[in-house]
Amino acid sequence: MTGITAEKHDSFISPTDNGQVIMEFSGKELVRGEPDASSFPSGGLRATFEARGYTAWDPTSYAFIKDNSLCIPTAFCSYGGEALDKKTPLLRSMQAINRQAMRVLKLFGNENVTSVKTTVGPEQEYFLVDQALYDKRKDLVYTGRTLYGAKPPKGQELDDHYFGSIKPRVSAYMRELNAELWKLGILAKTEHNEVAPAQHELAPIFTTTNIATDHNQLTMEIMQKVAKKHGLVCLLHEKPFAGVNGSGKHNNWSISTNTGANLLEPGDTPYANAQFLLFLCAVIKAVDEYQDLLRISVASAGNDHRLGANEAPPAVVSMFLGDELQRVLDAIETDTPYDSTEKEQMKVGVHVLPRFPKDTTDRNRTSPFAFTGNKFEFRMLGSTASISDANVVLNTAVAEALKQFADTLEGCPAETFEARLHTLIQDSIKAHKRIIFNGNGYDDAWIKEAERRGLSNLKSTPEALSHFLDAKNIALFTSHKVFTETELRSRHEIRLENYCKVLNIEALTMLDMAKKDILPAVSAYAGALAGTMNAKRAACPAADCSYEAELVEKLSRLTGCMYGKVKALEDTLMKVRELDSLEAQAMFYREQVFAAMNELRIGADELETLTAAEYWPFPTYGDLLFGVR
């Protein structure tokens, strides 16, 4: 439940009675393993003296060979059967949406359909920096992001990096990365420069959700390993550099049948369109009713830097459908013609929907959850996150909506089915249209409008996690057997604990860099300036020393101010120990510790702009962002 890939290696070696060894591996060992389950985050599910855990082969995800080892994707659970990983709940959520989607499809006469699955194509953003420069930055080494750094003269203002020509070292890295991913069966499809300097993106071909999740975990691991071969470091943190865009992960999600039909693709017949509209309404209903869970699924200390910062979607969850589909829903809701040239009302199951070419509307990059022709693009995920959490929520919430639809329609006489269906879709649109917003999500006016509509605006991870154990959320997961209540409570504890630990590590790193690197360096530079000033006056009493005098005064004043901020951060960290609950600690870290960290950074970044380059103790933003050529 750390969100990263775990490994355990078993050899084929076995002893024989005569003291020799043979190579064998039993089917039992293949199907089930027994690793230690106490050393991972478990949220109280396992104690140190309760170490037994089990791995179980996931036969729906491909085995592969990596570094001459046969790697078998597995689920991980405790001795008592509680899920200790992100794979098990994902597989359960896929079963849930399969069950409920099949009920709905049978109502439309899809007798040849035997299963439904969700598919995902996650786009992965990342930064590349030079290894030698990375090694000189404690903050990057310890936390994955820069905790200090003045804005360089040039950032992303010229928009010249996005889709720009790829630099030779980066191109060589991408070529080897593609080759390594293809060897593992990961179909990397697209790569390009992103908006910020040194930022890039990789996108694979979509596949079944649990396989896509495994592939994305592997992709992040391989990206970092290949980078080292090229003297680079791949940064996956959501916000490694202040002042330029951070990195996210777009989760392109759809639903398809075993016959190859995409259930989010408008059909060619009235009946097929009625089916599409019902599934569309299920997604709309799910996103509206469980907007808090979707926000929680992407909540992390790193992602808090992105959401709502005019580089990523706002923290308010909303849906973008595009103008054409919006007009269709409006026509159904109000029983009016879809087009002013038509005189007949739009009726579900009677009319053929107009075709929706994928390029008829601009892609709304400010929307957290956008319809893009035959899929939804969930854009709130952070770049380091496992895509499992978001897809567990999405699958389960849509399964619940489909269950309610099936409960309403099953048993309905054939002669009244279309009328009941039309009413159901119409009522769903009326009840959940507040979640649909096709405008600019970066506009402050939208935040006010969202509040008026009653949408949640959970701005930080502690604020979001406070709703994780709401009664409706527990009921959702337990009713579909995706999580037990015990498993939910353990995950809540793990998420809070992780948030606190991340901010604590960042704060301690800032203090370490300030006291051991920045303050001594600036003091040395001020001393050198003072020495230069005294030498000039000794050689020529009339010499103008105003530059040195003014700069020494300013450096001394700012150094004293920064030292005061260091002590303030230390005092603030000490107060955390006085708080008993994880909830209180997480909120304190967000409201008090994080604020003290920002205050400390302001002073340090100003000192960087005044200190000579040869005295500054670590590489600058200019070095890092433009150092790979």
Regions from the PLM with identified roles:
Residues 1-49:
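Short acidic/glycine-rich loops and adjacent helix/strand connectors
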Residues 7, 243-246:
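Short glycine/serine/proline-enriched coil/turn segments at secondary-structure junctions
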Residues 18, 285-293, 400-411, 520, ...:
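Short, well-ordered loop/turn and helix-capping segments at boundaries between secondary-structure elements
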Residues 21-22, 134, 231, 261-262, ...:
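Short amphipathic alpha-helical segments with coiled-coil-like heptad repeat character
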Residues 25, 364, 498:
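Residue-level signal for pocket-adjacent positions within structured domains
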Residues 38, 47-236, 245-248, 254-493:
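Glycine-rich, acidic/polar active-site loops that bind/position phosphate-bearing ligands
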Residues 240:
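Glycine-rich N-terminal segment of FAD-binding domains in flavoprotein oxidoreductases
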Residues 428-629:
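C-terminal amphipathic alpha-helical interaction region
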